[in-house]
Amino acid sequence: CFRLGRNIMIDMGPDIFTQALQYGSMCDIEHVLITHTHDDHFDFTALGLMSMATHLRTTPVHFYFSEEGYRFIELLRDSEIAFGGTLRGMEKKGIYAFHKLKYFETYSIGEYEVTPIRGNHGGNMAKERSANYVLKAKDGTKMLYGMDTGLYEEETLDFMKNQNLDIWISECTFGNLKLQEEWNTHLCADTFLELLDTFEKNKTIRQDTKIYLSHINQCHTAPHEKLQGIMTDAKPEYQIVVAYDGLEIPISRDGK
């Protein structure tokens, strides 16, 4: 998961409680943007444990999904698998609220303008495609959070033209593994660099855009230092950082 300031988080994976122990309480979280419903991004079982801390807050936690991703919530509401069928009760008690977002429409969520864009990656629902998020802060700082991404289709690339991003956080799931052409729903180093070239041509990014690589599968990639070296050698003119657990990123234009 990626915490954005005090009260917004992107995704809620199965390691959220370990992260809370290591990096601080999650009780201030008010909004959770879900990219897609694979369980490494939305571990619905965590909802049951989070509901035990309701005495620490008086307002619901709001979860946001793509329209197809929201269908997963509709299934959970009527399933005994989800806490014995008590999810509706949690909603009625004001513990959680679930919302649908449309691709390429902008919403005011917390202190950000949030625009979901269509990724090229599936989810638990048959027609689901990931929602990547363009987030604009009050000071104008603009960031793209791209998990899981794959190679974007033309509709998304067209939307991202001239976005002039300050920050780009991208997956690089398969690291330096050479992917077969049909494996285009995740990125490796080569396909990430291909996407970077497209973003450069389309003025989606600038040379001073801060770029971070995450969602890296340790089973299919070089060690951290080697992957960092690959990126530095390939694009020395860009600020590409291979991320790690606990990394803090300045998200304002004054570097704070």
Language-model segments: residues:
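Residue-level recognition of the N-termini of beta-strands and the immediately preceding loop/turn
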Residues: 29-30, 59-62, 91-96, 207-212
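Active-site metal-binding motif and surrounding structural segment of the metallo-beta-lactamase
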Residues: 7, 12-64, 165-166
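Active-site neighborhood of phospho(di)ester-bond hydrolases with catalytic His/Asp-centered motifs
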Residues: 9-13, 29-40, 64-67, 144-149, ...
